[in-house]
């Protein structure tokens, strides 16, 4: 059976205008056929043929109880999961999901330029990046620091922008194990323009490839 990448973009909270550009980018970057949906029933179906499930700027409560059970079983059993940007603004009422991603969104300052610091360059999502990467985005703060349960790949230099709230240890992208599965998350990707930026595209490509089984 051909593996597919299931890209889910349902929103019941804030909706990012960048979602169409993000989906187009993932189609181009994935080595697997991409199925894009906003139908929660797609997460209730058999996911065993998925190379990975991608929550691409989802927001709010987006899954049914059956979908929650199916996704948890899939990842714990060895499936891949990728969260992009607002994926951490999703499923606040489901404790497992917070554990899955490693952190939950708290707040962000204004969209503005800043510096991304390379913490771990030995990963497909970061091998191409310089030690300091100039980027423009929403610099997400998280309710908790994911470092205790995740391998941090990138962090923010809060001295390079206004309004940061996490201090010197401010993870922006990380990966982790969940059961037998692999999870990759990047908080970057607010604006449509990001998905045409070569360094960000390679960051996303590497994360997708690493998480996919």
Predicted regions mapped to residue ranges:
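Short, solvent-exposed loop/turn segments at secondary-structure junctions
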Residues: 12-13, 60, 88-90, 157-160, ...
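Extreme N-terminal starter segment of soluble prokaryotic enzymes
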Residues: 2-4
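Helical hinge/lid and interdomain linker segments adjacent to catalytic or ligand-binding clefts
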Residues: 6-10, 14-91
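A glycine-rich, often tryptophan-bearing local segment used as a flexible ligand/cofactor-contacting loop or short
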Residues: 61-128
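Oxidoreductase and adenylate-handling cofactor-binding alpha/beta cores
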Residues: 97-103, 135, 140-150, 189, ...
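Extracellular ligand-binding/catalytic regions of CAZymes and related secreted enzymes
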Residues: 9, 20, 25-29, 161, ...
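A structural signal for well-ordered alpha-helical segments within the folded catalytic domains
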Residues: 20, 24, 69, 92-95, ...
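Catalytic beta-strand/loop cores that center a nucleophilic Ser/Cys/Thr
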Residues: 29, 35, 49, 103, ...
């Amino acid at each position: 059976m051909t593996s597919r990448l299931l890209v889910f973009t349902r929103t019941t909270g804030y909706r990012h205008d960048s979602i169409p550009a993000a989906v187009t980018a993932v189609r181009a970057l994935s080595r697997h056929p991409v199925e894009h949906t906003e139908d929660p029933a797609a997460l209730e179906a058999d996911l065993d043929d998925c190379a990975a499930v991608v929550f691409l700027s989802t927001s709010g409560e987006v899954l049914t109880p059956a979908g929650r059970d199916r996704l948890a079983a899939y990842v714990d059993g060895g499936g891949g999961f990728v969260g992009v940007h607002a994926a951490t603004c999703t499923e606040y009422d489901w404790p497992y999901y917070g554990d899955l991603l490693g952190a939950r969104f708290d707040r962000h300052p204004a969209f503005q330029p800043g510096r991304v610091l390379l913490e771990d360059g030995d990963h497909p999502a970061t091998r191409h990046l310089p030690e300091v990467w100039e980027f423009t985005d929403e610099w997400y703060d998280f309710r908790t620091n994911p470092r205790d349960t995740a391998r941090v790949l990138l962090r923010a230099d809060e001295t390079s922008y206004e309004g940061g709230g996490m201090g010197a240890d401010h993870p922006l992208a990380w990966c982790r194990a969940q059961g037998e599965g692999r999870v990759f998350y990047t908080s970057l990707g607010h604006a449509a323009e990001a998905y045409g930026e070569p360094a960000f595209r390679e960051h996303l490509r590497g994360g997708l490839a690493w998480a996919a089984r």
